[in-house]
Amino acid sequence: MRATKDSGISWLGEYPSDWELKKIKYCLQERVEKNNPVRTTEILSLTAKQGVIPYDQKEGGGNKPKEDVSAYRLAYPGDIVMNSMNILSGSVGLSQYFGCVSPVYYMLRPWKVTEDVRYYNYTFQTTMFQRSLFGLGNGILIKESGNGKLNTIRMRIPMDKFGELFIPVAPIDEQQRIADFLDAKCAKIDALVAD
């Protein structure tokens, strides 16, 4: 049996004793790179269902992009992209694209290049983590859907508050094993859904 210890964090509970608890700001750095001068006109979108995609592949409605993309921020492949106003509803994804996004989006990447960004992305996508964010933002409406997902409308969480949160940090080799396992499981589920 693996030794665990109490995190003192209600959403997390116990975690493996050889892991660390760290503030997000010490694990991930925010990329704040403006698209000015314009380096790309490829606008990316982020949805809870589809993740980070080119805007023209987006299903359903949503905000229309601005024609002037010089105020947008740049996102790179390997960046965790999150909508600061919809984190609670699962608007978090790992970008496979270089493009520009609305300035309300955060782009995060590990401080250490050896760490597995997928591990952090999966952590942020857990319902338990997303529910722990209540009270951090300023919002208008919060609803729970029939499948247990939380839906919010404009619940903005400032990066300075987000960065102060503690998350469990596995050793690097274990981060990779966890992310590989979840990638394989998600691919299997996606294949079953597509059939």
Where are the regions a protein language model picked out?
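Sequence-specific dsDNA recognition surfaces
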Residues: 7-8, 25-36, 40-41, 46-77
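Short, ligand-facing micro-motifs at secondary-structure edges
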Residues: 42-61, 83-106, 118, 122, ...
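Ligand-binding loop in jelly-roll beta-barrel domains
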Residues: 111-117
